[in-house]
Amino acid sequence: MSSKSKALAVAAALTLAGGLSTVGTVAASAATPQCGNACVEVYSMKYATPASLGFVETVFLGIPVRGVPTIVQKASGSDPAEDLIVPLGGPVPVSQFYAEGMVSAAVDEHYGSEPAVQIEYAPYGKPTGLCTAVATTAYQDEGLSLQPCSAPGTTVWIIDVADSPATAPTYFPIVNGSDTDFVHPFAMTILGNPADQLFTPIIMQHLTGNPGSVPANQLWGAAHGTV
């Protein structure tokens, strides 16, 4: 990774950890007061901004059960289905997940210095042990769902600023830790406008346009806490 990419990765990690003020003051919160500043709101660049969260990652119907999908839903400060936390407190290098047996040697070789996280469902701030993930090694159009946070690879998310340096640190692709394609990796994607449909799943699709023109529906940002 180039020095510039490393700097952007650090900045994006700080943004996700809530330590960088690029997100500013958001106009709406997706964290309940009980979850507060521990919560992280993951939002699509296409349908939200740091100043107006719009639509954020949400557990479908708030059900804390393995296999329940995660979707994009309108941000709400009173819906515990939108309460997500980073269990380690913030991003860590992919190499740390490799040392813990959570990603493969190939993933570590390609992404080792880039930041990565797990994202745990924690309604009202209470951890469930279930993380947003994919059920198997990532494949085209696979939907995200809750899976045990102990599952290696599939529960790890890489903040892939190297594949979209022009939009970092505010927006970045989020690549699954089970990935085996390092040219066009499987990244979080949404299809359709969540304002016009009842159910908008988050799915895996090959990252396109990288590194110069990744589409907005494959770029994500993060905000923290209540307002």
Residue ranges of predicted features:
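Lectin-like carbohydrate-binding module/patch detector with strong preference for beta-trefoil
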Residues: 31-227
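Secretory targeting and sorting signals
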Residues: 1-30
